[in-house]
């Protein structure tokens, strides 16, 4: 059930809905921590499956577009987002990366509570507060100057010795007491209550009537200098904030300057322990390299500064009852266990299911049906079952066994829950499989995979239509798609003639997809898009691949025994060969126009990984340029990686590359390499 494509589409819908609630309506349904886990999981999936990345994905934005109800302010220097750490290990990795980039010199670290409010930029000209804007998308924000003028802790006039023009950045917030008072007043008036202080602060600042904002007990802490025309300011973030404190700006008194990472970790531990007693909401700690000149040396990567990181507080955990362990069927026949839970609210989201991965994972955690379990949403969109609460366990409960759970009394054996097919677990693998190649659940997932963006990219056929086409019997194997007619589609419920025509056109357009897309779309077990590209370049056409033997496959770099055996097994099945023949008869391109790699080409012997969003071309285009120059384009960072090309919103691959010492290339450096080649 939990295919990457389905999960990515569900995630984007969920994140976009929450963005609308959060940024536009100021009435979100989930906490910032829960939102972070959604974004983190989506980034992980897009890193693992780059063919699923789209320009409109929420991961491709810093924030949200400004509201048109307010004027637009262009930020002279972008308000960047921060990379996140969720453990001491990740924080230490950031510190070591920075040290290495700076040549192992010592540096001081600023430690600041990560306020859970609304980021704003305040510009002063000739001693007067001139403009105030929200973060917006990082490059443009909403002009909320009139509303910010009502906040008493924002000076309307700067001290005479202040720089002639400068911008400071701060977090507008509502204290816990102020939030409680505001909600009591709203309850008395019969108005809807705010979900949390952050929403209340954001909603207050986005009032079209400044008098409404003036009634709210808003406050601000300044956390950074955006820019200044005074070149005599100190080369220390700490001293700059101290300077602005002395000329009338409010700085958080809990900020600390430390000399070592151990001191920084201790600061975090103290803040986490005292989190509940803080007068405002905070969701972590921000660490910054103190020296401004060192900050400039370190620069940014994507849309995140290298010199700062946000160490988030732990995710919320709750207890609920695990009613049942269900089993879903994947496209290759994998039998995937998942927890069916008593509905429980975790960080503002009602959770009914959680991932369990496989039988070994369930037994390792000793999770049983009927248990009271601890659930958390940290790094997993599908929430995770952390552990059972043994003190609440029914003494008669039994350990979970996949084959016992799948036992079908009518067949007197374990069976696939969808088709009743026999199941097996290959030696050395963690997953059980349904052996029935005609299992309808498998084919539904296979069809979803074939039409997906990374494969044949047939627009208009998504998850739901794939299921309908399979269940209605219109498509019994993937080649049937190319024999559909508009009349066939018009038989389906809620299908109009224009939509049907568009789908038929999209199917026809897909016939010219490159060979590697076809190979990937066929869904051969263990053959991902990287392997499909290797096979396409090596064999040049599908029939040469179909006729190959195990020995030849094993001579191809990165094709191991498991992949080779899977390929041979796939093409030894006559039904698979018959599908490919029908694809060929329908006009699907089954040959490659790629040229063999010349060892004297500029990128020969180099292995590249591309991460994040590039401005000049898509990730797929960048990978094709690498291949055209003889290089290898991979999806995952390993010790063999020569270069990591880093775009905006880079994810976990960047952290992994830094931990392994892989050389990073900015987009401009990558383009320079292309031009010089």
From Swiss-Prot:
InterPro entries: BRCT_dom, BRCT_dom_sf, DisA/LigA_HHH, DNA_ligase, DNA_ligase_AS, DNA_ligase_CS, DNAligase_adenylation, DNAligase_N. Its EC number is 6.5.1.2. Its cofactor is Mg(2+); Mn(2+). NAD(+) binds at residues 32-36, 81-82, 112, 135, 171, 288, 312. Zn(2+) binds at residues 416, 419, 434, 439. NCBIfam families: dnlj, PRK07956.1. This is DNA ligase. The gene is ligA.
